[in-house]
UniProtKB/Swiss-Prot annotation:
Transmembrane segments: 16-36, 73-93, 97-117, 134-154, 168-188, 199-219, 236-256, 263-283, 288-308, 338-358
Protein's UniProt name: Phospho-N-acetylmuramoyl-pentapeptide-transferase
Cofactor(s) needed for function: Mg(2+)
Catalytic reaction annotation: UDP-N-acetyl-alpha-D-muramoyl-L-alanyl-gamma-D-glutamyl-meso-2,6-diaminopimeloyl-D-alanyl-D-alanine + di-trans,octa-cis-undecaprenyl phosphate = di-trans,octa-cis-undecaprenyl diphospho-N-acetyl-alpha-D-muramoyl-L-alanyl-D-glutamyl-meso-2,6-diaminopimeloyl-D-alanyl-D-alanine + UMP
Pathway annotation from the record: Cell wall biogenesis; peptidoglycan biosynthesis
């Protein structure tokens, strides 16, 4: 929005041309979303408290979590609104990728909002039934996949890129739709499963979002893409503004979500942020890199799959409780230790993901 204004004002003062630079608008995206989150966070927390929109805590979980009962939830709305405003202000609104990622984020956020609303407001412990949750995730995920497939302008946009193998890639054809569906829906649910401790999900999301933002910038620049032997995706660079907004909004939310949390993001935030990461990774053709950088999300998801499969097949549980962060809590780890160690793991994995830029 402001980019259009800057383009108009250039005829009066050439200095406004500085807003054409992606790096500047990415930084402004971070700062705008951060300021919005910090400024409106206290108001949102008070509003949620006044309306008694608080978290319910399971009795069979770690006993330390009982003190969290009643903590305001659905704070993910603060993240999404900050991301949305910042992106609309600083991104090029004629870029189709910006709209795809923004719409996917908001639509998955809507699914999470309905789920949270039923749990917290209607006091329905089941929330949105799983079949309906997955149905709408599938509808929106497939919709995004089909759109990206139909609007692909080059073959590389539907090709699976294998990091560290510069001369080998897999043309997917229509299989791109299937892969994209699983990446978007899978990452959405993976972040949601991780969101079980104060700050556990949001900081890895910020880190992975920052890593993907670097890939967006490089993939959208033909010279950098050719030099680094990564796919050149025209227009993908504009997503650095969205990634910047995600980082700013996430850090602003973490200010209130850090242990002991004043607010939880709820499904409205977790489902949306996971879907955003998946969609960005698909656009820049870095699904495997997302798998690496988001290793904490993958680990949390696998722990649930293993736990359920083991119990159904043998009647025994592999972990004391799943997702795996609860397993460590029940082993006696203090919550902050679990959180920070998972953050450290994410830092390492993001660096490994970025290292694939040169290991080709």
């Amino acid at each position: 929005m402001l980019l259009l204004l800057a383009e108009y004002l250039q005829q009066f003062y050439k200095g406004f041309a500085v807003f054409q630079y992606l790096t500047l608008r990415g930084i402004l995206g971070v700062l705008t979303a951060l300021v919005l989150s910090l400024c409106y966070g206290p108001w949102m927390i008070r509003t949620l408290q006044n309306r008694q929109i608080g978290q319910s805590v399971r009795n069979d979980g770690p006993q330390s979590h009982l003190s969290k009962s009643g903590t305001p939830t659905m704070g993910g709305a603060l993240i999404l609104s900050s991301i949305g405003v910042s992106t609309l202000l600083w991104a090029d609104l004629s870029n189709r990728y910006v709209w795809v990622v923004l719409l996917v984020t908001l639509l998955f956020g809507a699914i999470g909002w309905v789920d949270d609303y039923r749990k917290v407001i209607e006091k329905n412990s089941r929330g949105l039934p799983s079949r309906w949750k997955y149905f709408w995730q599938s509808v929106f995920g497939l919709g995004a996949a089909i759109f990206l497939y139909m609007t692909a302008s080059t073959p590389v946009e539907t090709t699976l890129i294998l990091p560290m193998l510069k001369d080998y890639s897999i043309p997917l054809g229509a299989g791109f739709i299937v892969l994209t569906y699983f990446v978007i829906v899978g990452s959405s649910n993976a972040v949601n499963l991780t969101d079980g401790l104060d700050g556990l999900a949001i900081m890895p999301t910020v880190m992975v979002g920052g890593g993907l933002g670097i890939f967006c910038y490089l993939s959208g620049n033909v010279k950098f893409a050719e030099y680094l032997l990564i796919p050149y995706v025209p227009g993908a660079g504009e997503l650095i503004v969205f990634c910047g907004a995600l980082i700013g909004a996430g850090l602003g939310f973490l200010w209130f979500n850090t242990y002991p949390a004043q607010v939880f993001m709820g499904d409205v935030g977790a489902l949306a942020l996971g879907a955003a990461l998946g969609t960005i990774a698909v656009i820049v053709r870095q699904e495997i890199v997302l798998f690496i950088m988001g290793g904490v999300f993958v680990m949390e998801t696998l722990s649930v799959v293993i736990q359920v499969a083991s119990f159904k097949l043998t009647g025994r549980r592999v972990f004391r409780m799943a997702p795996i962060h609860h397993h460590f809590e029940l082993k006696g780890w203090p919550e902050p230790r679990v959180i920070v160690r998972f953050w450290i793991i994410t830092v390492i994995l993001v660096l490994i993901g970025l290292a694939t830029l040169k290991l080709r």
